[in-house]
Amino acid sequence: MSMFDKKSIVFKKKELDLNEMVENIASTFSLRVEHTGGKIFTEIEAVDSAIYVDELHFQNAITNLMDNAVKYRKPEEPINIFIRTWNDNDRLYLSIRDNGQGIKRENIKKVFEKFYRVHTGNKHDVKGFGLGLAYVKKVIDLHQGEIKCESELGKGTKFTISLPVLHEQ
């Protein structure tokens, strides 16, 4: 995370297809999710899905959101993850929604802060330092994107990423 604080990170950006990236990540996570009895559902609706991003960092950001969905699931229930891509005006959107334990309303504003961790009441043995979502936000911000979090305790969480569409020159 310190490399982001110093702004010394150098992105190796290239043109990629978000729909393809999402399908690959969903495929990678399917066994972990199915192991809980759950499933990943994808709605690939974006027509303009070209993005200009650093593949490693952007993929890590999406993977982090998926990983959190699995880690913070309700222990007694299968986790279902719903991934959707779509376009609206000149933006490309990606949402990742789960039916996990959710986040209290007062904690939603803090989830992107460095070292902030939502207290889970020791239901989960989740390791970490509270840097994952701060990293995700920084990566999205540095790609001229936006990320927002919606959640309801006991019902699940949804992260929505918005990016500029890459147009042909």
Task: Annotate each predicted stretch with a short phrase.
Residues 69-70:
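Short helix-loop "hinge" at the ATP-lid/N-box region of the Bergerat-fold HATPase_c
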Residues 18, 102-110:
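Short helix N-cap motif at coil->helix boundaries in the Bergerat
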